[in-house]
Design a protein with these regions (language model features):
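Ubiquitin-like/PB1-type beta-grasp interaction modules and other compact soluble beta-rich domains
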Residues: 1-69
Length: 70
């Protein structure tokens, strides 16, 4: 069994079972399918990478949700 990974999501420390992809993280956060952008350690993560790219211990993740308005 793998050790859990510790990441920071929108400024809050979190712990998840490893391995963890961006798609799995977004499912855990109940954000899958929404309108948002994801940043990892200061770099935007393309949606096309969500299913394959794994998070690493110590990653800093920011999820910015798009809000419509006028």
């Amino acid at each position: 069994m793998s050790a859990p990974i510790r990441i920071v999501v929108n400024g809050a420390p979190r712990e998840f079972p490893a391995p963890l992809t961006f798609a799995q993280l977004l499912d855990e956060l109940a954000l899958a399918g929404g309108r948002f952008a994801v940043e990892r350690n200061g770099e935007i993560v393309p949606r096309s990478h969500f299913g394959d790219e794994r998070l690493a211990d110590g990653d800093q993740i920011e999820v910015v949700i798009a809000v419509g308005g006028g």
